[in-house]
Design a protein with these regions (language model features):
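Catalytic cores of Mg2+-dependent Asp-rich isoprenoid enzymes
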Residues: 1-167, 171-279
């Protein structure tokens, strides 16, 4: 019967991830079956924590996040949880021996979101490390099947990819982050302060990180390479759309990659991965 609960828990993480991110879900679907559920487990955990600080406005978020953090450590220690998302997450963390410091840094970044602030260069880097880079490192542990040598060799590239993805999210979501949640992640830039020069600097920084990250993606095992490459190509397409979009439009609407464009990315990415090895 425990196996039935484990499957149920895994299914919950899958549904949670798919409900909130169709793009990531598509990338995960292109991973080998053996590792797919573990990446869903990581993203289910991340999504639930993020939801606490982003959506539960009528409740005491600080209390809820603290409780979630305590339940996380209990689940990891006892290797069981009555929360299905934490159950599937603890199974993945314990199986792949994911460093708990990564989880601690992630939860710290969620705490940073509890109080609106304008970020400095230092707090910006701190937030990106905890909210995105460590998530990439958790996934990397799964991608390399816990191989420490491969993990350390690919770690710098995973960090760059996580950072680039998060910065694209920041630029895409700048309207809602500032207007609804009172957050401004880019250092010393509030919503109305974004101009063409600052937008260009942000995009150039992201493009440089994406270029570095690609070298790491090319070295991933076949079991994960295509799925990660697909996510990379999606974010690259979104970055290019943001680059071509005026600042005023970015500040007033959420820029998206439409379904037709996603279909083209899917086909192109598969052909490049299968026959051209990413060229």
């Amino acid at each position: 019967m425990k196996q039935l609960y484990d499957k149920f828990s895994s299914d919950v993480s899958v549904k949670l991830t798919k409900a909130y991110s169709t793009s990531f879900s598509l990338g995960i679907l292109c991973l080998d079956t053996e590792i797919r559920r573990h990446i869903y487990a990581i993203y289910g955990f991340v999504r639930l924590a993020d939801e606490i600080v982003d959506s539960f406005h009528d409740y005491d978020k600080e209390v809820l996040l603290k409780r979630f953090e305590q339940e996380t450590w209990t689940a990891l220690d006892e290797k069981i949880s009555l929360n299905p998302v934490l159950q599937s997450f603890q199974e993945t963390v314990n199986q792949y021996k994911i460093d708990r410091d990564l989880i601690k840094q992630f939860l710290h970044s969620m705490e940073m979101d509890l109080k609106p602030k304008v970020y400095t260069n230092t707090t910006y880097r701190e937030y990106i490390f905890g909210s995105a880079e460590v998530v990439g490192l958790m996934c990397l542990k799964v991608f390399v099947s816990g191989d420490d040598q491969a993990y350390h060799e690919l770690k710098p590239y995973a960090i760059k990819l996580g950072s680039a993805f998060q910065k694209v999210n920041f630029l895409r979501d700048i309207k809602d982050d500032f207007g609804v949640l009172g957050r401004s992640y880019f250092p010393n830039i509030q919503n109305q302060d974004l101009d063409h020069a600052s937008k260009t600097a942000i995009i150039d920084d992201i493009a440089n990180e994406m270029n570095v990250a690609l070298h790491g993606i090319q070295r991933l095992p076949a079991s994960s390479g295509y799925g990660v490459y697909l996510a990379y190509k999606y974010y690259l397409a979104l970055l290019n759309k943001l680059k071509k979009t005026s600042v005023s439009k970015i500040l007033n609407e959420r820029i998206r990659v439409n379904n037709f464009e996603k279909s083209l990315i899917f086909v192109e990415s598969y052909l490049k991965f299968r026959f051209l090895r990413y060229r």
